[in-house]
């Protein structure tokens, strides 16, 4: 994502969040949303946030800062890296409450595409999955073999707007995800 920045000090982090006004700050290595903070520029005054950010920067070398998107719907795509090739396994539709995973939709691929069709076409989904395969194949070849998932999001351009876009990579999970389990 071109709008995601990696910063390695608290001063740069504060500056970026002030510029964005609303941002998502993520630890590079975390799970289940525990390394994620949703911020407004006003929340930067919280000493608890500063302590958290400094600790992550010290232990992990930095944090990522990205815009806070106007989420309409969460979804993902599941893949597997096998013998240097990337295989698309299917869609993952899941629910999130208070920014934490709560469960997956158990449905056929056709039913999941039907749920998403008011936001994204079959052709767009195919193009996104193909692009992930093309990008991840050289990135993972000889480095990682196994399942992985890419969390994605349908976003409104403005709060409450019907004008939407797809963010094709909110997060990359180099592991078996609950989306893989739902596909089984």
Predicted regions, residues:
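Short acidic/polar capping segments at secondary-structure boundaries
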Residues: 10-12, 28-32, 69-71
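Active-site "cap" helix and flanking loop/linker of ATP-utilizing ligase/carboxylase catalytic domains
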Residues: 139, 175-184
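Active-site-proximal flexible loops/turns
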Residues: 33, 158, 178, 182
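Nucleic-acid 5′ end/cap handling module spanning
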Residues: 38-40, 164-169, 182
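Phosphate-binding site of ATP-dependent enzymes
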Residues: 20-21, 47-101, 153-169, 173-177
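Glycine-rich phosphate-binding loop of ATP-grasp-fold ATP-dependent ligases
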Residues: 2-7, 22-49, 76, 98-116
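A long amphipathic alpha-helix within ATP-dependent nucleotide-binding catalytic cores
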Residues: 58-67, 88, 101-164
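Phosphate-interacting basic helix/loop segments used at nucleotide- and nucleic-acid interfaces
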Residues: 3-14, 131-141
